[in-house]
Regions:
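Flexible, membrane-associating and regulatory peripheral segments of lipid-active enzymes
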Residues: 2-135
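Short, well-ordered beta-to-alpha junction loops that form the rim of enzyme active sites
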Residues: 100, 147-148
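Short acidic/His/Gly/Ser-rich catalytic and metal-binding motifs that mark active-site loops
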Residues: 104-108, 151-156
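Conserved alpha/beta-hydrolase
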Residues: 140-147
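Charged, often glycine-rich, active-site loop that binds/positions anionic groups
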Residues: 153-165
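Chitinase-like catalytic core of GlcNAc-active glycosidases
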Residues: 168-172
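Conserved small/polar residues in nucleotide/adenosyl-binding loops
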Residues: 175-177
Length: 177
């Protein structure tokens, strides 16, 4: 019985070592298999010139209120004084923040904007904004748009579809404020 157990342990060790070797040799190919969409690129309809007047296309902008993820602050620890910036010394400035790609779905090359977008990408984008845009809370205005971000796999391939997806993410999201 002990011999069978040792054979099993040896088999598991060999399997882990073989898996690690395969991963080291083929990690780029494995990332492409896992993240690059296999679907054809379908061009997205350009946004209207005034599309960003709609508050639904913004994660953060003046007037959103307490649900603004870019204005998030961690809770104060008990007994710690609240840090309040002196408004008279702080210069007025605005921050325009474009969050990194949060769309990991292989279903399409670009994240949808219609019907609230991809729920998982929206959740991740809000986390990114809390962590990356909230340090700019001293700004008088923080603007963070929703955009047709390219899927993560578009950055991992040399295929023309990937380039088209990246171009669509940034070229079609021109913002006229």
């Amino acid at each position: 019985m002990a011999r069978k157990f040792l054979y099993f342990v040896a088999f598991c060790i060999v399997l882990v070592i073989a898996g690690r070797i395969v991963y080291e040799l083929f990690q780029e190919e494995l990332a492409e298999i896992a993240l690059v969409p296999s679907a054809e690129f379908s061009p997205v309809k350009p946004l209207e010139a005034n599309a960003y007047e709609d508050s639904k296309l913004w994660y953060s902008r003046p007037g959103i209120g307490v649900k603004d993820p870019a204005r998030w602050q961690p809770p104060l620890t008990e007994g710690a004084p609240a840090a309040t910036p002196d408004a008279t010394k702080a210069p007025r400035f605005a921050v325009f923040f474009v969050h990194p790609t949060s769309y990991l779905n292989r279903a399409s090359w670009n994240a949808p904007l219609e019907n609230g977008g991809d729920p998982e990408a929206e959740r991740i984008a809000r986390i990114y904004l809390r962590g990356m845009a909230s340090p700019f809370n001293a700004a008088s205005e923080i603007w963070a748009p929703r955009y047709r971000q390219a899927t993560m796999g578009a950055f991992l391939t040399d295929a023309t579809e990937g380039k088209k997806a990246i171009d669509a993410a940034y070229a079609l999201s021109l913002i006229h404020i």
